[in-house]
Amino acid sequence: TAFATPIAIAIPPKVDRFIIDTYCPAVVTKSFPQSGITVFGAFPHTHLQGQSVWTKIIRNKKAVEYLFNAEAYNFNYQFENILPKPIKLYPGDELATRCVYHTTNKNEISLGGEKTKDEMCMHMFMYYPRMKNFYGCSTINSLESWSRLMNSSASSFDFEVFRKWLIELKWTPELSEQWQNFYNNAPRVVVSGPTNNITLTNLARLPDYEDLKPAECKRSIINTAIRSVFLSMSFTLTSFFVTIASRFF
């Protein structure tokens, strides 16, 4: 999850596809019970510009499966999704989450925030047994990385100056491409733990991992399914016409 703040989410306008990746490292899940927790539901959430949200389970630097994949996300059509089968998470597991945005309909930057016109990147899960010392895992781009991008040498980070700078940026395709590169490589700060006792973990960059292999298209299965549907429709239509004919003859 990325915090709903401009420090975490600042998406250029007029971009067909902008990616924000977040990462929950092993240090966050080390307090999970040794027997694991069982995830049985998922609720992905962005605002109007979001197109897809997914979270992968990373185990020993290798993606083992999707925890959930909302490949075709729509803000106006949101669900609490019950998983086809429960999934176990264990101490030391890591979670990689990606939100993808489409902003070709916008003329100004989209910033993280709670208003519908702002943006979010969240993936919430239902699980058991309950853990009292675990609330969530969120990331922001480090303040130092933003200061370097702004070419600022100020001794402290001024959030109002930062927000004003973002809003006044003049966007070009080249700047949007540079912006994506910044997001791909910027150091992150991971915020985790209960709200009254949060833990901050620094990531020099998003960790690398061996990704899932692309799923193969089962063309023969698809063709068989289409053929079955076609035959079923043909039989239904034939029965319909026979019924109609019997009424007139």
Each language-model region and where it sits:
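Beta-strand-centric surfaces of beta-sandwich/beta-rich domains
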Residues: 1-221
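C-terminal membrane-anchoring or membrane-association module
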Residues: 244-249
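C-terminal GPI-anchoring signal of eukaryotic secretory precursors
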Residues: 217-237
